[in-house]
Amino acid sequence: MIRSGYGKYAGLSKEEQDAEIERPGQHSTNWFDELFRNSVSQSHNLSLSGGSEKSTYYISLGYSKNNGLVKKSEYDRYSIASKIDIKPNKRVKMGLAADMGWQRSRGSSGSVDPFKYAYFANPYERPYNDDGSYSADRTYYSIRSANGGLDLPLPEVGFNLMREMDHTSLKDNNFNLTLIGNMSVNILENLSFEGLASFSYVTDNSDNFNGKDTYAAWQDRPFDDPFTSKRTYSNIMQSSTYNRSYNLRGQLHYFNTFNDIHYISTLLGSEIRGQYAKSIFTKRYGYDPVTGNSAIPIYPEDTSVDYEKLQRYASIVDGLSGQSIVEDKFASFYFSLDYVLLKRYILSFTARTDGSNNFGNDQQFNPTGSLGLAWNIDQEKFFEPLKKWMSSLSLRSSFGYTGNINKSVSPKLIMDYLGRLRQTDECSYRIGVIKNPPNPKLRWEKTRDWKLSLDAGFFNERLHFTGEFYNRRTTDAVSNVKVARTTGFSDQAYNTSTLENTGVEFSLTGTFLKTKDWRGTASANIAYNYNKLVDYNSSVSGLSTGVHKGYPLGSIFSGKVQGIDPQLGIYTYERRPDVSFETAADRNNYANYLFYLGTSNAPWNGGYSLSVGYKQLNLSLGGSYSINGKKINNIKSPVNYISVGSSSVETPPAQIYDLYVNHLNVRKDATERWTPTNPRTDANPRIIDAFGEFIGLKNYITSSETIANASMLENVSYCKLSSLSLSYGFNESLIKRWGLGSLAVSFTMNNIFTITNYSGIDPETPGAVYPLARQFTFGVAVGL
């Protein structure tokens, strides 16, 4: 912008331009420090309990406050939980529980993502001028004007994220109430009835306000031309939502032992549940935060208002309020049977059918069931000689079916009403588009599951091993597929896919230290899961879609990087052996370079924990690890060559080549590149100006981003120390002198450190622009 002599830089000499270019380098803003803070939270709980042989009670009061990670954000919550259990006679038990909570959150409206802004904003931009006023960011929304084009105008005061945080707000108030009643009646000695009834009510009210001088308000001016008008007005979006739900369950339970060797337990019951949710919203322009009133903007006095403009104005007003209603109902009937012979052989059988109004009329009920077998080998006589070192051994297997409801689809025709009406002299007609075509054959997703597991204990259970092998197959999974446009739709979601998961999991728990004063335990587990798409009926299924039969979900299909061409400065890729490369079209066809490179879902995962204690002092830690997950480490910049808005001469294959992403902040290693004068092959590829010199890359190699992204593919394996906790419980004889029943203090750290070769910010959340925050917690527990 400076060298081009554009705008306020017009007429500057080279020396003056040099001075202007050098000036920003004299200042560096750490935007993460400006926008974020060390969050301090506190939580307090007080509980009371007591009772007699026939009745007990429990009451808990809680308060928590969290000053958010983002400045100007905070969260408060008040809660009360109570429970009373009554036993009026030997046959009847009753209980009633009530939980209430009220929470309040405050923050900015979030019209601009502060995490993304902090990552990409240029460090030479300033949050404030020397006089304390807001300093306008000259680059974040100005890539077009910086390159001689025409940007959408900004407010006269410019864009400044600190102003957005100070003069926009999002206030949310939430109240929830849950009532639960249960009853158990011993009808006979071995027959009982168990019932449960619950009711929940949740209400949420939010106000989203944008001050008139903010960029958020500037972007939301439906009554004005965005290019010619400079008029601004504040706005507020207010919404109110409530949800009420219920659950009723009743079951008969019979159990008995015969001849001291047969034990049987059976359940027969049913359950109904449902929910009703309603949401109402309204938006007001010209809102005054002092009085709470609003004055809706009208066209300027000298504006010629024809019928078309009047219709547009009415359409805007019509869309300023609305409501939505959701209602769901479910019914279930179930039966279970457990049989134990000689405490060695166990059989479990379950059967149930569930019904939902989320499916077609003849598909609403889904029968499922399971069968399980277990053998307690350690109860056999031949096991006696082994008990000196193996204390327990059991073998279990199970087979069954379950059902799942995919709430993203509906059997009914769903219409999205637009925010305007078609007006006539006599009436107004709603206008909408069909979002979801009817599907009376929509049905449950069904999963067949079988498992085989082994449990073994050694040395009086000081060491315990569990191993499990499983196979899980889901049929009628809902997938979005392309359909013939003659149907009136380009795609539709219905029951079309079959998925399969196969895996093993091993866990080991041990007590390695056990004396009068010392104790120590450790555990670790590792799991391997392989999933694949067995069936997918779609005309567009293929490698390029990332959805292909025989491959895992989350598959990554891209190119195999061979290195940087020293002559051209671009990445070259391995060619598929089953295709020919005779023409430029062959060399540019991305499918000729496409390979399966792995999956974003790591096949190996696990965790570990360690606990060591000495008398009342205890130290524990825990963590997790993941092996061989893959991720394209490419955080999309808010700007690129397309943002300039001109016709390109040469298409950069991927963001890593694009000159115009350097308009905003980039990684330090972006300067390490191949250049014609320094043809490095151990750094980043060349910079490509989409509007500069024609290179003709597509004559040599594919320009597809799908292939070019392979250069940013990384392994996101990691090992993480997730938590570290130190606690101390004061000696009972000591605290009694203070009139206390118990006293303990604790200190906990979370998200401590991660070991990884991933070059991004956080391998646990790859692609994020801010890592999971490290947390420190100090706690005190007092009992009276």
Residue ranges, per PLM feature:
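Residues embedded in well-ordered regular secondary structure
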Residues: 1-71, 109-112, 138-156, 160-170, ...
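Conserved small-residue
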Residues: 1-23, 273, 278-290, 494, ...
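Extracellular/periplasmic, surface-exposed regions of secreted and cell-surface proteins
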Residues: 10-13, 42, 77, 83-92, ...
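Transmembrane beta-barrel wall of Gram-negative outer-membrane proteins
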Residues: 33-108, 125-130, 136-137, 176-180
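C-terminal beta-signal and adjacent terminal beta-strands/loops
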Residues: 34-35, 388, 613-704, 729-775, ...
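A generic structural motif
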Residues: 65-69, 355-357, 512, 601-602, ...
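Aromatic- and acidic-residue-enriched carbohydrate-binding clefts of CAZyme catalytic domains
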Residues: 219-231
